[in-house]
Amino acid sequence: MKTFVLHIFIFALVAFASASRDSAKKIGSQYDNYETCLTEHGLTDDDIFSIGEVSSGQHKTNHEDTELHKNGCVLQCMLEKDGLMSGADYDEEKMREDYIKETGTEPGDQRIEALNACMQETKDMEDKCDKSLLLVACVLAAEAVLADSNEGA
């Protein structure tokens, strides 16, 4: 019995460490064009917000508007290089397809509905950088809420 409890404790610790590690990652750092877009915008990895900071909304209160805008420009650059945006316009279908492929979601998954809602919420924004950051922040926040609600279920 002690061994079983120890295994559960270790599993929970590993799961927590994995989630913490992901939240410390920089937004977009897992994508091919990350370094290219940082260079194009004259930024370093230190200038980019962490996933945890964005998913919790802390990026809005902890940073100046210029930092928010610059982070959004890096995100927009990556989205454009991946064919998901052109200027300030989304390719909604391609964005859904890539999201499904990346997350392994199935039709009807709440995360797809969240992506759709986030695209709808930001679609009329004219500034491509602010629009990109708001979209990514919206999706990350929705994923965090859904993950929390699934843990409680």
UniProtKB/Swiss-Prot annotation:
<dbReference type="InterPro" id="IPR006170">
    <property type="entry name" value="PBP/GOBP"/>
</dbReference>
<dbReference type="GO" id="GO:0005615">
    <property type="term" value="C:extracellular space"/>
</dbReference>
<dbReference type="GO" id="GO:0035176">
    <property type="term" value="P:social behavior"/>
</dbReference>
<comment type="subunit">
    <text>Homodimer.</text>
</comment>
<dbReference type="Pfam" id="PF01395">
    <property type="entry name" value="PBP_GOBP"/>
</dbReference>
<protein>
    <recommendedName>
        <fullName>Pheromone-binding protein Gp-9</fullName>
    </recommendedName>
</protein>
<feature type="disulfide bond">
    <location>
        <begin position="73"/>
        <end position="129"/>
    </location>
</feature>
<keyword id="KW-0590">Pheromone-binding</keyword>
<dbReference type="InterPro" id="IPR022354">
    <property type="entry name" value="Pheromone-bd_protein_Gp-9"/>
</dbReference>
<dbReference type="GO" id="GO:0005550">
    <property type="term" value="F:pheromone binding"/>
</dbReference>
<keyword id="KW-0732">Signal</keyword>
<dbReference type="GO" id="GO:0019236">
    <property type="term" value="P:response to pheromone"/>
</dbReference>
<feature type="disulfide bond">
    <location>
        <begin position="37"/>
        <end position="77"/>
    </location>
</feature>
<comment type="function">
    <text>Colony queen number, a major feature of social organization, is associated with worker genotype for Gp-9. Colonies are headed by either a single reproductive queen (monogyne form) or multiple queens (polygyne form). Differences in worker Gp-9 genotypes between social forms may cause differences in workers' abilities to recognize queens and regulate their numbers.</text>
</comment>
<keyword id="KW-0085">Behavior</keyword>
<keyword id="KW-0813">Transport</keyword>
<feature type="disulfide bond">
    <location>
        <begin position="118"/>
        <end position="138"/>
    </location>
</feature>
<feature type="signal peptide">
    <location>
        <begin position="1"/>
        <end position="19"/>
    </location>
</feature>
<comment type="similarity">
    <text>Belongs to the PBP/GOBP family.</text>
</comment>
<keyword id="KW-0589">Pheromone response</keyword>
<keyword id="KW-1015">Disulfide bond</keyword>
<dbReference type="InterPro" id="IPR036728">
    <property type="entry name" value="PBP_GOBP_sf"/>
</dbReference>
<keyword id="KW-0964">Secreted</keyword>
